[in-house]
Structure formats: structure tokens, C-alpha cells
């Protein structure tokens, strides 16, 4: 779960930007899209293949 603590002198906009960045890094939106619709075995294979390729680059 992503959590952001707003500092005493920090604006809401900057806290919201930090929250969006953390959600993006955690991959929450991608997982939400994946869980929202049925995924065929071929789609699952392609997704995992793509993940492996991405992890090799890093």
C-alpha cells in the first residue's frame, strides 16, 4: 500500500505528485488493469515475457 505523509510546510500539490510517482513505481495501475479483465494464457505469456525483457535491461 502506498502512503504519503504531508509535511508541515508542504503543499498538497507536491504531496499529490509524490503519491502519483510512488503509485507509478509500484505498478499499481498496471496490476489494476490486469485484474479488471480476463487474461488469456497467451496474453499472460506475452506479459511475463515482456517483464523478463524489462528486468534484463535494468
Curated annotation (Swiss-Prot):
GO molecular function annotation: structural constituent of ribosome
GO process annotations (BP): translation
Keyword flag Nucleus: no
GO CC terms of this entry: ribonucleoprotein complex; ribosome
Coiled coil segments of this chain: none
Basic residues bias (residue ranges): 45-58
Renumbered residue ranges of the record's region Disordered: 36-58
A Pfam family of this chain: Ribosomal_S21
Keywords: Ribonucleoprotein, Ribosomal protein
Entry's family note: Belongs to the bacterial ribosomal protein bS21 family.
HAMAP family referenced in this protein's UniProt entry, alphabetically: Ribosomal_bS21
NCBIfam families linked: S21p (TIGR00030)
Protein name: Small ribosomal subunit protein bS21
Amino acid at each position: 500500500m502506498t502512503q504519503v505523509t504531508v509535511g508541515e510546510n508542504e503543499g498538497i500539490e507536491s504531496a499529490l505528485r509524490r503519491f502519483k510517482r510512488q503509485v507509478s513505481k509500484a505498478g499499481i495501475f498496471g496490476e489494476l488493469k490486469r485484474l479488471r479483465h480476463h487474461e488469456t494464457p497467451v496474453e499472460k505469456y506475452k506479459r511475463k515475457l515482456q517483464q523478463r525483457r524489462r528486468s534484463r535491461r535494468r
